[in-house]
Amino acid sequence: EIGSGLVGSEMCIRDSVETDKFLLTSKLILTPFTSFILVSVIRKCIDAKRPYEKYNIKPLFIKETKGESMPSRHVFSITIIAMCWLYVSVPVGIIMLMLVAIMAASRVLAGVHFVRDVVVGFAVGIICGIAGLWII
């Protein structure tokens, strides 16, 4: 029968993939992906002004973006990547989380984010990482 060949192929493929590796790979791809979409939607909804918009200052980075300042997507992104590393290698994850501070400071000092933007970006990255990697 036609259908039985497809079922047999599916079983063969499923048996050849280690469930633990498949689950790990799925988590490491889907957690950042879905979290990034969530953060992008939150930014559009909040639409917070950036420091250079609010105080009419010139940012150190060439930036013409208006609004969408909170949460910081750069800080969120490096945080969620650090959480993925923490999930597979604690020492590397800890180093990556320390690097988040440098990224956060650079975004604030450059005048493209407020402190609250980077703190919220970090917090959302931690929460999404815990939820997507350890809880779900």
What is the role of each PLM region?
Residues 1-8, 12-13:
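Single conserved hydrophobic/aromatic residue that forms the stacking wall/gate
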Residues 14-38:
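Interfacial segments of alpha-helical transmembrane regions
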Residues 19, 44-52, 111-116:
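Transmembrane helix-loop junctions in multipass membrane proteins, especially transporters and channels
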Residues 56-136:
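Membrane-embedded catalytic cores of phosphoryl/pyrophosphoryl-handling enzymes
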